[in-house]
């Protein structure tokens, strides 16, 4: 049976982290799974919660002594998966602030079982909804991703940025091997990293599918949006780089 690895980027998530851990456990009852939390220099009780819950849950924590940002956190989680996961394992990435309901892990895994290499929880499918995001932000997102579908088309994909995904571990291993540190080049652009990762997995031939889901942004503590101008600039740079380098090359040997 394939192992399920749930990858959580954690940064000051004490308010909802414990609830999320319990919900992941409930969603994966009957499965062989492990939670891998990449703690990005949290200054609250997140690390203590993870250490305490490791007594009753299969939790591995990768720790950043200081905050390094979402992209570096995601990259380090992918490197962990490439090193430790078996070829048949499945890696699920999701936010640790409880905005991503673990109940959607099951339909994501169903898409993997049906032949997908990457299954995405999409905000832009019939039956999807976004709760707690103002209308103007939703319209802005629709416009940005419509442009990405024109300039960086991926068959079957409407949501390029949602980080709630299931991926085959062997695909992640190949991506880490082929791209090396260039797997996420735009690390300083924050949330752009999820679209960059998806595009590079697509360039490796990944079959991508989506399932509808409800994003509960009203559960989030604080604000996590990038300014609109920086978002546009980041996606513009991603489009430019995607056109400038259409095929991955072998990483340099050092």
Q: What is each of the regions a protein language model found here?
A:
Residues 1-4, 15, 30, 107, ...:
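Hydrophobic helical membrane-anchoring modules
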Residues 60, 64-83, 88-90, 102-184, ...:
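Acceptor/aglycone-binding surface of glycosyltransferases and processive sugar-polymer synthases
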Residues 5-9, 36-37, 63:
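Short hydrophobic beta-strand elements that form part
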Residues 39-48, 66, 98:
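A conserved acidic beta->alpha catalytic loop
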Residues 20, 46, 74, 103-105, ...:
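Acidic donor-diphosphate engagement hotspot in glycosyltransferases and nucleotidyltransferases
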Residues 8-22, 41:
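Active-site beta-to-alpha loop of glycosyltransferases that engages the nucleotide-sugar donor
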Residues 22-32:
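Short, acidic, metal-binding catalytic loop of nucleotide-sugar glycosyltransferases
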């Amino acid at each position: 049976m394939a192992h399920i690895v749930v990858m959580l980027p954690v940064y000051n998530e004490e308010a909802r982290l414990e609830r999320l851990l319990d919900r992941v456990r409930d969603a994966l009852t009957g499965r062989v799974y492990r939670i891998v939390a990449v703690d990005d220099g949290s200054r609250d009780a997140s690390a203590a919660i993870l250490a305490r819950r490791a007594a009753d849950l299969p939790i591995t924590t990768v720790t950043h002594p200081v905050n390094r940002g979402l992209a570096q956190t995601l990259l380090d989680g992918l490197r962990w998966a490439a090193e430790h996961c078996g070829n048949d394992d499945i890696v699920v990435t999701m936010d640790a602030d409880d905005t991503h309901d673990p109940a959607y892990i099951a339909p994501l895994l169903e898409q993997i079982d049906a032949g997908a290499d990457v299954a995405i929880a999409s905000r832009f499918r019939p039956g999807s909804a976004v709760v707690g995001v103002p209308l103007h932000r939703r319209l802005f997102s629709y416009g940005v991703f419509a442009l990405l579908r024109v300039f960086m088309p991926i068959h079957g994909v409407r949501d390029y940025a949602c980080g709630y995904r299931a991926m085959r571990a062997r695909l992640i291993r190949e991506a880490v091997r082929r791209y090396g540190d260039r797997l996420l080049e735009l690390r300083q652009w924050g949330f752009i990293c999820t679209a960059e990762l998806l595009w590079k997995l697509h360039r490796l031939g990944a079959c991508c599918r989506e399932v509808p889901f409800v994003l509960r942004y009203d559960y989030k503590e604080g604000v996590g949006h990038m300014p609109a101008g920086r978002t546009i600039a980041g996606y513009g740079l991603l489009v430019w780089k995607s056109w400038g380098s259409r095929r991955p090359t072998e990483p340099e040997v050092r």
